[in-house]
Amino acid sequence: MATSAPLRSLEEEVTCSICLDYLRDPVTIDCGHVFCRSCTTDVRPISGSRPVCPLCKKPFKKENIRPVWQLASLVENIERLKVDKGRQPGEVTREQQDAKLCERHREKLHYYCEDDGKLLCVMCRESREHRPHTAVLMEKAAQPHREKILNHLSTLRRDRDKIQGFQAKGEADILAALKKLQDQRQYIVAEFEQGHQFLREREEHLLEQLAKLEQELTEGREKFKSRGVGELARLALVISELEGKAQQPAAELMQDTRDFLNRYPRKKFWVGKPIARVVKKKTGEFSDKLLSLQRGLREFQGKLLRDLEYKTVSVTLDPQSASGYLQLSEDWKCVTYTSLYKSAYLHPQQFDCEPGVLGSKGFTWGKVYWEVEVEREGWSEDEEEGDEEEEGEEEEEEEEAGYGDGYDDWETDEDEESLGDEEEEEEEEEEEVLESCMVGVARDSVKRKGDLSLRPEDGVWALRLSSSGIWANTSPEAELFPALRPRRVGIALDYEGGTVTFTNAESQELIYTFTATFTRRLVPFLWLKWPGTRLLLRP
């Protein structure tokens, strides 16, 4: 729509002579001409130090520049009128959409009163109420707040970027962990399948060997039976003929007695062994293989269960709790017994009468495992001697199983002497009971002064080892009979499960298990009154 002549005339009146656009924030200079505020700042002095008016060339002072509020309002109204002329009926103006209007004068808000903290239009700014106040352009007043908002926004954006980066890294870590778990799952399945395959192959191999032995025994049995039946038949025929000959009259018997006896010379009849020596040897070797299999599987099961269920921990001894009868190594992992009390100063945490010592590390949860090595000359030799005795007994049993030979057991003078010395041996065993050691766990609050029983009711769960045997330190003591004397005692503590399990760390044989409800901190416990013996914590 074409602009009308009156409106065009008004537009010319409110047009800046410098920028040829509507007067923006109009101001008047000393000569009375009106320009945009921003245009006056761009005016440069032609001669001298004062700028001159672009129209009349008269100099003016910038400090004398004054705003023309009414003209600014007129410019707004012209712009609004121009827009409204092209607006459809009922359509909301852009100013009404984008800007708030003064509630009093319905004019656009341009200024901000710093004294009252209110937004002002041109009319409000020139009113008696706000004229003495400091009023600045709304954009200028908003600039510091906008900068604060932008600074805060920048901080928030950095925080957002950090969170997004943290989330991305966390997601990547989780995905990597899940991938690792999947790989470990496949590894577990593959390893167990390989183990199953190996065990199946070994099982089939052993069963094949067993089947061959069964076949050899069965064939030997048939030969043994057949040979025995043949010998019995031959003997029956001879017996029958001799019985008939014995019933003959004397005259008939004496006619050919010599010839008859010569036909049946006296000979040894066959007495064979039911099992061939080679087969018997193979059977014994197979029994040894089964023992090795049993021992190997037991060690494997014990080690696997220990490694998967329990955490192996490295423990040390607490020197402040060590009795004066004990001597600790520099690394606090080895203890020896001395018959002389060496402690000059009795620490409050020290055992005074009992030769005991506690571990420096305690446990209040979880499943943990450590070992105690018993180092003593001859500690493992008794076991080997026992094996030799068992082998000798087996040889004697084989000799007794022979055919046609036998022997009687006669008591010797040495046996009588040994029977007479039983009382002396019993007295020596009673003395050996005093020379022993204990390994186990104890509450960190266990009593340490005076003579102690060191039993579960006192907060100690331990085994007692000596050259004469092994006992669980219960009330009363329970003697134990493990297959092998342990050179290393494994101690497995399940705090929540309430168990302390002792095993032979080398053969994985279960020795004893204490059950209890633990409520206090538990620490390793050693007790040693055995000259020539050392206890070492492993690892």
From Swiss-Prot:
Binding-site residues, Zn(2+): C102, H105, C124, H130
Top class in the EC scheme: transferase
InterPro entries: B30.2/SPRY (IPR001870), B30.2/SPRY_sf (IPR043136), Butyrophylin_SPRY (IPR003879), ConA-like_dom_sf (IPR013320), PRY (IPR006574), SPRY_dom (IPR003877), TRIM/RBCC (IPR050143), Znf_B-box (IPR000315)
Subunit relationships: Interacts with TBK1; this interaction bridges together TBK1 and NEMO in order to activate TBK1. Interacts with INCA1.
Domain B30.2/SPRY span(s) in chain numbering: 295-539
EC number in record: 2.3.2.27
Zn finger intervals (B box-type): 97-138
Stimuli inducing this protein: By cytokine TGF-beta and binding of activated SMAD3 to the TRIM26 promoter. Upon herpes simplex virus type 2/HHV-2 infection. By type I interferon.
GO biological processes: host-mediated suppression of symbiont invasion; innate immune response; positive regulation of DNA-binding transcription factor activity; positive regulation of non-canonical NF-kappaB signal transduction; proteasome-mediated ubiquitin-dependent protein catabolic process; protein K11-linked ubiquitination; suppression of viral release by host
UniProt PTM: Autoubiquitinates upon viral infection. In turn, autoubiquitinated TRIM26 recruits NEMO and bridges TBK1-NEMO interaction.
Record's protein name: Tripartite motif-containing protein 26
This protein's GO CC annotations: cytoplasm; cytosol; nucleus
Family label: Belongs to the TRIM/RBCC family.
Known catalytic reactions: S-ubiquitinyl-[E2 ubiquitin-conjugating enzyme]-L-cysteine + [acceptor protein]-L-lysine = [E2 ubiquitin-conjugating enzyme]-L-cysteine + N(6)-ubiquitinyl-[acceptor protein]-L-lysine
Region (Disordered): 376-437
Stretches with biased composition (Acidic residues): 380-434
Listed result of changing C16A: Strong loss of ubiquitination activity
Keywords: Coiled coil, Cytoplasm, Immunity, Innate immunity, Metal-binding, Nucleus, Transferase, Ubl conjugation, Zinc, Zinc-finger
CDD domains linked to this entry: Bbox2_TRIM10-like, RING-HC_TRIM26_C-IV, SPRY_PRY_TRIM15
Residue ranges that the Swiss-Prot or TrEMBL entry lists as coiled coil: 188-227
Major subcellular location class: cytoplasm
Zinc fingers, RING-type class: 16-57
